[in-house]
Protein backbone atom coordinates (compact mmCIF):
# COMPACT_ATOMS: atom_id res chain seq x y z
CA UNK A 1 0.00 0.00 0.00
CA UNK A 2 2.93 2.32 0.66
CA UNK A 3 3.71 2.34 -3.05
CA UNK A 4 0.62 4.54 -3.44
CA UNK A 5 0.57 6.44 -0.14
CA UNK A 6 4.19 7.65 -0.18
CA UNK A 7 4.15 8.99 -3.79
CA UNK A 8 0.94 10.86 -2.97
CA UNK A 9 2.58 12.46 0.07
CA UNK A 10 5.58 13.37 -2.10
CA UNK A 11 3.20 15.23 -4.41
CA UNK A 12 3.21 18.08 -1.87
CA UNK A 13 6.97 18.87 -2.00
CA UNK A 14 6.82 18.45 -5.79
CA UNK A 15 4.17 21.17 -5.93
CA UNK A 16 6.20 23.63 -3.86
CA UNK A 17 9.44 22.95 -5.77
CA UNK A 18 7.93 23.27 -9.25
CA UNK A 19 8.59 26.32 -11.41
CA UNK A 20 5.75 28.67 -12.25
CA UNK A 21 5.12 27.40 -15.78
CA UNK A 22 5.59 23.71 -14.90
CA UNK A 23 3.33 23.45 -11.88
CA UNK A 24 0.28 21.97 -13.64
CA UNK A 25 2.28 19.71 -15.95
CA UNK A 26 4.36 18.23 -13.12
CA UNK A 27 1.50 17.57 -10.72
CA UNK A 28 -0.89 16.20 -13.35
CA UNK A 29 1.58 13.76 -14.92
CA UNK A 30 2.86 12.66 -11.54
CA UNK A 31 -0.64 11.99 -10.17
CA UNK A 32 -1.55 10.18 -13.39
CA UNK A 33 1.46 7.90 -12.84
CA UNK A 34 0.27 7.19 -9.29
CA UNK A 35 -3.16 6.23 -10.60
CA UNK A 36 -1.60 3.89 -13.16
CA UNK A 37 0.43 2.19 -10.40
CA UNK A 38 -2.72 1.68 -8.35
CA UNK A 39 -4.38 -0.26 -11.17
CA UNK A 40 -2.38 -3.33 -10.16
CA UNK A 41 -4.52 -3.57 -7.02
CA UNK A 42 -7.56 -4.49 -9.10
CA UNK A 43 -5.90 -7.72 -10.17
CA UNK A 44 -6.42 -9.68 -6.98
CA UNK A 45 -5.89 -13.40 -7.36
CA UNK A 46 -8.73 -15.35 -5.85
CA UNK A 47 -6.90 -16.67 -2.82
CA UNK A 48 -6.84 -15.20 0.64
CA UNK A 49 -3.56 -13.36 0.30
CA UNK A 50 -4.90 -9.89 0.96
CA UNK A 51 -2.32 -7.24 0.16
CA UNK A 52 -2.06 -6.24 3.76
CA UNK A 53 0.34 -5.05 6.39
CA UNK A 54 -0.68 -4.40 9.98
CA UNK A 55 -1.83 -0.88 9.07
CA UNK A 56 -3.13 -0.99 5.51
CA UNK A 57 -4.75 -3.66 3.37
CA UNK A 58 -6.82 -3.81 0.23
CA UNK A 59 -9.51 -6.27 -0.72
CA UNK A 60 -11.98 -6.42 -3.63
CA UNK A 61 -14.19 -3.79 -1.95
CA UNK A 62 -11.59 -1.14 -1.20
CA UNK A 63 -9.46 -1.62 -4.33
CA UNK A 64 -11.97 -0.18 -6.87
CA UNK A 65 -12.68 2.79 -4.59
CA UNK A 66 -8.96 3.32 -4.13
CA UNK A 67 -8.32 3.29 -7.87
CA UNK A 68 -11.23 5.73 -8.34
CA UNK A 69 -9.65 8.05 -5.76
CA UNK A 70 -6.24 8.03 -7.43
CA UNK A 71 -7.80 8.36 -10.89
CA UNK A 72 -9.68 11.50 -9.94
CA UNK A 73 -6.71 13.54 -8.70
CA UNK A 74 -5.21 14.23 -12.18
CA UNK A 75 -8.72 14.94 -13.46
CA UNK A 76 -9.35 17.46 -10.66
CA UNK A 77 -6.05 19.18 -11.43
CA UNK A 78 -6.95 19.36 -15.12
CA UNK A 79 -10.38 20.78 -14.36
CA UNK A 80 -9.07 23.43 -11.95
CA UNK A 81 -6.54 25.03 -14.28
CA UNK A 82 -8.79 27.65 -15.79
CA UNK A 83 -10.41 29.08 -12.68
CA UNK A 84 -7.06 29.28 -10.89
CA UNK A 85 -5.28 31.01 -13.78
CA UNK A 86 -5.85 34.47 -12.25
CA UNK A 87 -4.67 33.46 -8.76
CA UNK A 88 -1.14 34.20 -7.46
CA UNK A 89 1.32 31.31 -7.55
CA UNK A 90 1.34 30.60 -3.83
CA UNK A 91 -2.42 30.09 -3.81
CA UNK A 92 -2.23 27.68 -6.72
CA UNK A 93 0.38 25.70 -4.82
CA UNK A 94 -1.72 25.76 -1.66
CA UNK A 95 -4.73 24.50 -3.62
CA UNK A 96 -2.81 21.59 -5.13
CA UNK A 97 -1.34 20.80 -1.69
CA UNK A 98 -4.87 20.65 -0.25
CA UNK A 99 -5.95 18.26 -3.00
CA UNK A 100 -2.90 16.05 -2.44
CA UNK A 101 -3.52 16.06 1.30
CA UNK A 102 -7.16 15.09 0.80
CA UNK A 103 -6.05 12.36 -1.59
CA UNK A 104 -3.60 10.94 0.99
CA UNK A 105 -6.25 10.88 3.71
CA UNK A 106 -8.76 9.22 1.38
CA UNK A 107 -6.35 6.49 0.29
CA UNK A 108 -5.49 5.77 3.91
CA UNK A 109 -9.18 5.74 4.86
CA UNK A 110 -10.03 3.19 2.19
CA UNK A 111 -7.14 0.94 3.21
CA UNK A 112 -7.11 1.20 7.02
CA UNK A 113 -7.28 -2.10 8.91
CA UNK A 114 -8.24 -0.70 12.31
CA UNK A 115 -11.64 0.83 12.81
CA UNK A 116 -10.26 3.61 15.01
CA UNK A 117 -7.69 4.64 12.41
CA UNK A 118 -10.50 4.46 9.84
CA UNK A 119 -12.52 6.85 12.01
CA UNK A 120 -9.64 9.30 12.50
CA UNK A 121 -8.87 9.41 8.78
CA UNK A 122 -12.58 9.61 7.95
CA UNK A 123 -12.71 12.79 10.04
CA UNK A 124 -9.39 14.07 8.68
CA UNK A 125 -10.78 14.23 5.14
CA UNK A 126 -13.10 16.93 6.46
CA UNK A 127 -10.35 19.54 6.94
CA UNK A 128 -8.93 19.86 3.37
CA UNK A 129 -12.45 19.67 1.90
CA UNK A 130 -13.63 22.44 4.18
CA UNK A 131 -10.66 24.63 3.25
CA UNK A 132 -11.23 24.01 -0.46
CA UNK A 133 -14.94 24.90 -0.20
CA UNK A 134 -14.61 27.97 2.01
CA UNK A 135 -11.48 29.39 0.39
CA UNK A 136 -11.99 28.84 -3.34
CA UNK A 137 -15.79 28.72 -3.65
CA UNK A 138 -17.53 31.13 -6.00
CA UNK A 139 -20.14 32.96 -3.90
CA UNK A 140 -20.14 34.34 -0.38
CA UNK A 141 -22.61 31.62 0.68
CA UNK A 142 -19.63 29.25 0.66
CA UNK A 143 -18.99 29.99 4.36
CA UNK A 144 -22.54 28.96 5.18
CA UNK A 145 -22.13 25.82 3.07
CA UNK A 146 -18.86 24.97 4.81
CA UNK A 147 -20.51 25.39 8.20
CA UNK A 148 -23.38 23.06 7.23
CA UNK A 149 -20.93 20.52 5.87
CA UNK A 150 -18.75 20.60 8.98
CA UNK A 151 -21.52 20.40 11.55
CA UNK A 152 -23.62 17.74 9.83
CA UNK A 153 -20.59 15.49 9.41
CA UNK A 154 -19.14 16.09 12.88
CA UNK A 155 -22.41 15.74 14.80
CA UNK A 156 -23.23 12.65 12.74
CA UNK A 157 -19.94 10.94 13.48
CA UNK A 158 -19.38 11.75 17.15
CA UNK A 159 -21.65 8.89 18.32
CA UNK A 160 -19.64 6.56 16.07
CA UNK A 161 -16.55 7.11 18.21
CA UNK A 162 -18.45 6.18 21.38
CA UNK A 163 -19.86 3.12 19.60
CA UNK A 164 -16.40 2.05 18.47
CA UNK A 165 -15.02 2.28 22.00
CA UNK A 166 -17.94 0.17 23.19
CA UNK A 167 -17.30 -2.44 20.46
CA UNK A 168 -13.64 -2.45 21.49
CA UNK A 169 -14.70 -3.29 25.06
CA UNK A 170 -17.07 -5.97 23.81
CA UNK A 171 -14.81 -7.78 21.34
CA UNK A 172 -11.30 -6.75 22.36
CA UNK A 173 -10.36 -5.77 18.81
CA UNK A 174 -11.37 -3.32 16.13
CA UNK A 175 -9.44 -4.96 13.31
CA UNK A 176 -11.46 -5.42 10.11
CA UNK A 177 -9.75 -8.72 9.40
CA UNK A 178 -10.22 -10.18 12.89
CA UNK A 179 -13.70 -8.89 13.60
CA UNK A 180 -15.19 -10.92 10.75
CA UNK A 181 -14.45 -14.03 12.80
CA UNK A 182 -16.19 -12.67 15.88
CA UNK A 183 -19.15 -15.02 15.78
CA UNK A 184 -21.11 -13.98 18.87
CA UNK A 185 -24.30 -12.23 17.87
CA UNK A 186 -25.12 -8.96 19.62
CA UNK A 187 -27.95 -9.63 22.09
CA UNK A 188 -31.20 -7.72 21.63
CA UNK A 189 -31.14 -4.84 24.05
CA UNK A 190 -31.75 -1.11 23.97
CA UNK A 191 -28.06 -0.38 24.31
CA UNK A 192 -27.29 -2.47 21.24
CA UNK A 193 -30.03 -0.74 19.26
CA UNK A 194 -28.40 2.58 20.12
CA UNK A 195 -25.03 1.08 19.22
CA UNK A 196 -26.40 0.20 15.77
CA UNK A 197 -27.84 3.69 15.34
CA UNK A 198 -24.58 5.34 16.41
CA UNK A 199 -22.55 3.21 13.99
CA UNK A 200 -24.85 3.74 11.03
CA UNK A 201 -25.77 7.39 11.52
CA UNK A 202 -22.28 8.71 10.78
CA UNK A 203 -22.25 6.96 7.43
CA UNK A 204 -25.87 7.79 6.64
CA UNK A 205 -25.21 11.50 7.13
CA UNK A 206 -22.22 11.13 4.82
CA UNK A 207 -24.14 9.23 2.15
CA UNK A 208 -26.52 11.28 2.65
CA UNK A 209 -29.79 9.73 3.78
CA UNK A 210 -32.93 11.60 2.74
CA UNK A 211 -33.69 13.99 5.59
CA UNK A 212 -30.02 14.42 6.51
CA UNK A 213 -29.06 15.71 3.08
CA UNK A 214 -29.28 19.49 3.59
CA UNK A 215 -25.52 19.98 3.59
CA UNK A 216 -24.94 18.25 0.25
CA UNK A 217 -26.61 20.60 -2.30
CA UNK A 218 -25.20 23.61 -0.43
CA UNK A 219 -21.66 22.24 -0.37
CA UNK A 220 -21.84 21.13 -4.02
CA UNK A 221 -23.19 24.39 -5.35
CA UNK A 222 -20.68 26.56 -3.49
CA UNK A 223 -17.57 24.40 -3.93
CA UNK A 224 -15.05 25.05 -6.72
CA UNK A 225 -14.89 22.41 -9.44
CA UNK A 226 -12.33 20.14 -7.76
CA UNK A 227 -14.32 20.35 -4.51
CA UNK A 228 -17.50 19.31 -6.31
CA UNK A 229 -15.76 16.47 -8.10
CA UNK A 230 -14.13 14.99 -5.01
CA UNK A 231 -17.29 15.48 -2.95
CA UNK A 232 -19.56 13.73 -5.44
CA UNK A 233 -17.14 11.05 -6.52
CA UNK A 234 -15.37 10.00 -3.35
CA UNK A 235 -16.59 11.58 -0.12
CA UNK A 236 -20.10 10.19 -0.60
CA UNK A 237 -18.57 6.77 -1.22
CA UNK A 238 -16.89 6.89 2.19
CA UNK A 239 -20.37 6.54 3.66
CA UNK A 240 -21.19 3.51 1.52
CA UNK A 241 -17.82 1.92 2.19
CA UNK A 242 -18.18 2.42 5.96
CA UNK A 243 -21.68 0.94 5.91
CA UNK A 244 -20.55 -2.10 3.94
CA UNK A 245 -17.68 -2.64 6.38
CA UNK A 246 -19.57 -2.08 9.61
CA UNK A 247 -22.78 -4.04 8.87
CA UNK A 248 -20.71 -7.23 9.17
CA UNK A 249 -20.24 -6.79 12.90
CA UNK A 250 -23.72 -5.55 13.75
CA UNK A 251 -25.64 -8.72 13.03
CA UNK A 252 -28.40 -9.61 13.79
CA UNK A 253 -29.40 -6.02 14.71
CA UNK A 254 -29.47 -4.89 11.09
CA UNK A 255 -32.20 -7.38 10.20
CA UNK A 256 -34.91 -5.55 12.11
CA UNK A 257 -33.31 -2.10 12.51
CA UNK A 258 -33.02 -1.65 8.76
CA UNK A 259 -36.76 -1.35 8.06
CA UNK A 260 -37.34 2.36 8.83
CA UNK A 261 -34.15 3.35 7.00
CA UNK A 262 -35.02 1.19 4.01
CA UNK A 263 -38.43 2.84 3.80
CA UNK A 264 -36.92 6.30 4.21
CA UNK A 265 -34.36 5.64 1.47
CA UNK A 266 -36.91 4.21 -0.94
CA UNK A 267 -39.16 7.20 -0.34
CA UNK A 268 -36.27 9.67 -0.38
CA UNK A 269 -34.90 8.40 -3.66
CA UNK A 270 -38.20 9.21 -5.38
CA UNK A 271 -38.51 12.54 -3.57
CA UNK A 272 -34.99 13.73 -4.47
CA UNK A 273 -35.47 12.59 -8.08
CA UNK A 274 -38.66 14.65 -8.17
CA UNK A 275 -36.85 17.65 -6.66
CA UNK A 276 -34.42 17.39 -9.60
CA UNK A 277 -37.27 18.04 -12.03
CA UNK A 278 -37.94 21.41 -10.38
CA UNK A 279 -34.36 22.69 -10.22
CA UNK A 280 -33.23 25.84 -12.00
CA UNK A 281 -29.61 25.62 -10.85
CA UNK A 282 -27.52 23.17 -12.86
CA UNK A 283 -25.08 22.21 -10.11
CA UNK A 284 -27.94 21.81 -7.64
CA UNK A 285 -29.70 19.41 -10.02
CA UNK A 286 -26.59 17.23 -10.29
CA UNK A 287 -26.19 17.33 -6.49
CA UNK A 288 -29.77 16.14 -5.92
CA UNK A 289 -29.31 13.40 -8.51
CA UNK A 290 -26.33 12.23 -6.41
CA UNK A 291 -28.61 11.99 -3.37
CA UNK A 292 -31.11 9.84 -5.25
CA UNK A 293 -28.38 7.51 -6.54
CA UNK A 294 -26.86 7.16 -3.08
CA UNK A 295 -30.29 6.29 -1.66
CA UNK A 296 -30.17 3.21 -3.89
CA UNK A 297 -26.82 2.29 -2.35
CA UNK A 298 -28.25 2.64 1.19
CA UNK A 299 -31.14 0.33 0.20
CA UNK A 300 -28.68 -2.18 -1.25
CA UNK A 301 -26.44 -2.21 1.82
CA UNK A 302 -29.34 -2.64 4.23
CA UNK A 303 -30.90 -5.54 2.29
CA UNK A 304 -27.66 -7.44 2.94
CA UNK A 305 -27.61 -10.05 0.21
CA UNK A 306 -24.53 -10.84 -1.92
CA UNK A 307 -26.32 -9.48 -4.99
CA UNK A 308 -27.23 -6.20 -3.37
CA UNK A 309 -23.66 -5.78 -2.12
CA UNK A 310 -22.40 -6.25 -5.67
CA UNK A 311 -24.96 -3.72 -6.89
CA UNK A 312 -23.95 -1.21 -4.22
CA UNK A 313 -20.24 -1.42 -5.09
CA UNK A 314 -20.84 -1.19 -8.85
CA UNK A 315 -23.23 1.73 -8.41
CA UNK A 316 -20.77 3.62 -6.22
CA UNK A 317 -17.97 3.39 -8.79
CA UNK A 318 -20.29 4.18 -11.72
CA UNK A 319 -21.82 7.15 -9.96
CA UNK A 320 -18.41 8.45 -8.95
CA UNK A 321 -17.28 8.72 -12.56
CA UNK A 322 -20.63 9.91 -13.96
CA UNK A 323 -21.39 12.67 -11.46
CA UNK A 324 -17.81 13.88 -11.60
CA UNK A 325 -18.14 14.17 -15.37
CA UNK A 326 -21.42 16.05 -15.06
CA UNK A 327 -19.84 18.53 -12.65
CA UNK A 328 -16.97 19.08 -15.09
CA UNK A 329 -19.45 19.79 -17.88
CA UNK A 330 -21.45 22.15 -15.67
CA UNK A 331 -18.22 23.91 -14.76
CA UNK A 332 -17.15 24.34 -18.38
CA UNK A 333 -20.56 25.94 -19.04
CA UNK A 334 -20.14 28.16 -16.00
CA UNK A 335 -16.70 29.35 -17.09
CA UNK A 336 -18.18 30.56 -20.38
CA UNK A 337 -21.60 31.93 -19.40
CA UNK A 338 -20.80 32.86 -15.76
CA UNK A 339 -24.17 31.56 -14.65
CA UNK A 340 -25.38 28.29 -13.21
CA UNK A 341 -29.02 29.02 -14.08
CA UNK A 342 -30.08 26.60 -16.80
CA UNK A 343 -32.49 29.02 -18.51
CA UNK A 344 -29.68 31.53 -19.08
CA UNK A 345 -27.28 28.99 -20.57
CA UNK A 346 -29.53 27.14 -22.99
CA UNK A 347 -29.03 26.15 -26.59
CA UNK A 348 -25.30 25.62 -26.25
CA UNK A 349 -25.28 22.82 -28.81
CA UNK A 350 -25.01 25.29 -31.69
CA UNK A 351 -22.06 27.04 -30.05
CA UNK A 352 -20.18 24.06 -28.57
CA UNK A 353 -21.06 21.01 -30.70
CA UNK A 354 -18.36 18.73 -29.28
CA UNK A 355 -19.37 19.57 -25.70
CA UNK A 356 -22.93 18.59 -26.64
CA UNK A 357 -21.67 15.10 -27.49
CA UNK A 358 -20.09 14.81 -24.04
CA UNK A 359 -23.32 16.11 -22.44
CA UNK A 360 -25.28 13.44 -24.29
CA UNK A 361 -22.92 10.67 -23.18
CA UNK A 362 -22.90 11.87 -19.56
CA UNK A 363 -26.70 12.17 -19.42
CA UNK A 364 -27.14 8.71 -20.88
CA UNK A 365 -24.77 7.11 -18.40
CA UNK A 366 -26.51 9.03 -15.61
CA UNK A 367 -29.90 7.57 -16.55
CA UNK A 368 -28.30 4.08 -16.60
CA UNK A 369 -28.46 3.27 -20.28
CA UNK A 370 -27.33 -0.26 -21.15
CA UNK A 371 -24.53 -1.41 -21.31
CA UNK A 372 -23.06 1.09 -18.81
CA UNK A 373 -22.00 -0.06 -15.34
CA UNK A 374 -24.66 2.27 -13.90
CA UNK A 375 -27.21 -0.15 -15.34
CA UNK A 376 -25.40 -3.18 -13.90
CA UNK A 377 -25.42 -1.62 -10.43
CA UNK A 378 -29.05 -0.50 -10.61
CA UNK A 379 -30.17 -3.83 -12.01
CA UNK A 380 -28.55 -5.73 -9.14
CA UNK A 381 -30.10 -3.41 -6.57
CA UNK A 382 -33.55 -3.60 -8.20
CA UNK A 383 -33.44 -7.40 -8.37
CA UNK A 384 -32.28 -7.86 -4.80
CA UNK A 385 -34.86 -5.39 -3.47
CA UNK A 386 -37.57 -7.13 -5.52
CA UNK A 387 -36.67 -10.47 -3.98
CA UNK A 388 -36.74 -8.80 -0.55
CA UNK A 389 -40.22 -7.36 -1.11
CA UNK A 390 -42.22 -7.36 -4.32
CA UNK A 391 -43.81 -3.95 -3.69
CA UNK A 392 -40.45 -2.18 -4.03
CA UNK A 393 -40.61 -2.74 -7.80
CA UNK A 394 -43.20 0.07 -8.02
CA UNK A 395 -40.90 2.50 -6.21
CA UNK A 396 -37.82 1.38 -8.13
CA UNK A 397 -39.65 1.65 -11.45
CA UNK A 398 -40.88 5.13 -10.59
CA UNK A 399 -37.38 6.17 -9.59
CA UNK A 400 -35.80 4.89 -12.80
CA UNK A 401 -38.45 6.71 -14.86
CA UNK A 402 -37.95 10.01 -13.02
CA UNK A 403 -34.16 9.62 -13.34
CA UNK A 404 -34.54 9.31 -17.11
CA UNK A 405 -36.85 12.34 -17.08
CA UNK A 406 -34.54 14.69 -15.20
CA UNK A 407 -31.46 13.56 -17.12
CA UNK A 408 -33.21 14.37 -20.40
CA UNK A 409 -34.56 17.61 -18.91
CA UNK A 410 -31.02 18.63 -18.03
CA UNK A 411 -29.73 17.70 -21.49
CA UNK A 412 -32.51 19.47 -23.40
CA UNK A 413 -32.43 22.63 -21.27
CA UNK A 414 -28.69 23.14 -21.56
CA UNK A 415 -28.12 21.96 -25.14
CA UNK A 416 -31.25 22.32 -27.26
CA UNK A 417 -33.40 25.29 -28.23
CA UNK A 418 -32.38 28.77 -29.29
CA UNK A 419 -29.44 30.24 -27.41
CA UNK A 420 -29.91 33.49 -25.49
CA UNK A 421 -28.58 36.79 -26.86
CA UNK A 422 -25.99 37.47 -24.19
CA UNK A 423 -23.83 34.45 -25.05
CA UNK A 424 -23.04 35.04 -28.71
CA UNK A 425 -19.26 35.22 -28.31
CA UNK A 426 -17.85 32.46 -26.14
CA UNK A 427 -14.62 30.51 -26.25
CA UNK A 428 -14.66 27.16 -28.04
CA UNK A 429 -14.06 24.00 -26.03
CA UNK A 430 -10.42 23.46 -25.15
CA UNK A 431 -8.47 20.27 -25.80
CA UNK A 432 -7.92 20.12 -22.04
CA UNK A 433 -11.67 19.89 -21.44
CA UNK A 434 -12.22 17.28 -24.12
CA UNK A 435 -9.37 15.20 -22.73
CA UNK A 436 -10.91 15.56 -19.27
CA UNK A 437 -14.28 14.26 -20.46
CA UNK A 438 -12.61 11.44 -22.38
CA UNK A 439 -10.73 10.38 -19.24
CA UNK A 440 -14.03 10.23 -17.36
CA UNK A 441 -15.81 8.34 -20.11
CA UNK A 442 -13.14 5.77 -20.98
CA UNK A 443 -13.19 3.92 -17.62
CA UNK A 444 -17.00 3.83 -17.72
CA UNK A 445 -16.99 2.23 -21.16
CA UNK A 446 -14.11 -0.13 -20.41
CA UNK A 447 -15.62 -1.30 -17.12
CA UNK A 448 -18.82 -2.28 -18.91
CA UNK A 449 -16.69 -4.85 -20.78
CA UNK A 450 -15.37 -6.39 -17.57
CA UNK A 451 -17.56 -5.36 -14.64
CA UNK A 452 -16.47 -8.15 -12.31
CA UNK A 453 -13.45 -6.18 -11.06
CA UNK A 454 -15.74 -3.63 -9.41
CA UNK A 455 -18.37 -5.97 -7.99
CA UNK A 456 -16.83 -6.09 -4.52
CA UNK A 457 -16.09 -8.95 -2.17
CA UNK A 458 -19.29 -10.95 -2.69
CA UNK A 459 -18.64 -11.67 -6.38
UniProtKB/Swiss-Prot annotation:
Family statement: Belongs to the complex I subunit 4 family.
GO molecular function, one term: NADH dehydrogenase (ubiquinone) activity
Catalytic activity: a ubiquinone + NADH + 5 H(+)(in) = a ubiquinol + NAD(+) + 4 H(+)(out)
Gene Ontology annotations for the cellular component aspect, listed alphabetically: mitochondrial inner membrane
Role: Core subunit of the mitochondrial membrane respiratory chain NADH dehydrogenase (Complex I) which catalyzes electron transfer from NADH through the respiratory chain, using ubiquinone as an electron acceptor. Essential for the catalytic activity and assembly of complex I.
Family matches, as Pfam families: Oxidored_q5_N, Proton_antipo_M
Name of this chain's protein: NADH-ubiquinone oxidoreductase chain 4
The protein's assembly and partners: Core subunit of respiratory chain NADH dehydrogenase (Complex I) which is composed of 45 different subunits.
Subcellular location, principal: mitochondrion
Annotated compartments: Mitochondrion inner membrane
Topology term for the membrane: Multi-pass membrane protein
UniProt superkingdom: Eukaryota
Keywords: Electron transport, Membrane, Mitochondrion, Mitochondrion inner membrane, NAD, Respiratory chain, Translocase, Transmembrane, Transmembrane helix, Transport, Ubiquinone
InterPro entries linked: NADH4_N, NADH_Q_OxRdtase_chainM/4, NADH_UbQ_OxRdtase, ND/Mrp_TM
Transmembrane segments: 22-42, 60-80, 95-112, 113-133, 147-167, 192-212, 224-244, 256-276, 284-303, 308-330, 351-371, 391-411
The enzyme's E.C. designation: 7.1.1.2
NCBIfam families: NDH_I_M
Amino acid sequence: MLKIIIPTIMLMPLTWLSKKNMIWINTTTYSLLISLISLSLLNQPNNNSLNFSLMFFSDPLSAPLLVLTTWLLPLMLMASQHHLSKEPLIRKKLYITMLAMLQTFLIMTFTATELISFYILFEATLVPTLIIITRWGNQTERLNAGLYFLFYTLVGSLPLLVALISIQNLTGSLNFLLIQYWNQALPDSWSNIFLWLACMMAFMVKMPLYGLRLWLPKAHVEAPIAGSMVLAAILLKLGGYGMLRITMMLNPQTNFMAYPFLMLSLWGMIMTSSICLRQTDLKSLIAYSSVSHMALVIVAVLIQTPWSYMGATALMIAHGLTSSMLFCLANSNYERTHSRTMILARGLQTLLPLMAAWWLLASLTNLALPPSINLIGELFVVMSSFSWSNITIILMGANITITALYSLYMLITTQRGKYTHHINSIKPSFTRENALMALHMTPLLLLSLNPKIILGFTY
